[in-house]
Amino acid sequence: MTPVQINNIDHADLRVSPRAGPAFGDAANQALVFPAEFEELQREFAIIFRRRDEGLQAYALLGLDRDENLFLSGDFWTSRYVPASHQRGPFSIGMVRGTSDAVSQPMLHVDRDDPRVGDDDGLPLFLEHGGNTPYLEHVTGVLRLLYEGMESASAAYAALDDAGLLAPVTLTIDVSEERRYTVPDVLVVDVERLAALTGEPLERLHHAGILRLAILAAASLANVQQLIARKQRLPGTAA
């Protein structure tokens, strides 16, 4: 991996392919996600939480078997929305210290070792006269979401946990009469506890924007049915 800071002089003609695929880490049965995505995510994916050493993290369920992404077909996603952690492609944020400023600033980088970088059939990053293309603006927005999400997600999820809204469960998913999957060690928003919130706790979560996250995450669990339907459409999977 060779991350290089992007600029419109050295990379004026650089093109990058937005294609996806197993070679680029898209063959995964879950994707790390962040609060700013929840509204888009809940239309497509089930949102679950897991306790990690670094704290609570949220994930979108993508598949049931190991390395299975039921929303991936060849080199593109079939969902209307793609989690930002996968939208970013070969781009990343790197901290760069200016010559006259002791404070490091987040700057856009691209991995020159990624085969999508320099693809003649890819999308340009800069306009003819130096401005950013819509593709580069999109990538910048995705990375901003990820950067800000990593800063704010822990506090948001801790607020859900402190309010008693996250319940530990083992998801049981029946694809057919003969095939059952379990997803252990996850937490989901408890709908009954959410509905029972009243008074000051309810007001506090509402004003902090946490209540909305809880409602979106709870609603997203209905998408397990979509996951089952996609699994059943695979060859050799009986309904």
Enumerate the predicted regions with their spans:
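Short linear motifs in intrinsically disordered
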Residues: 35-40, 82-84, 99, 162-165
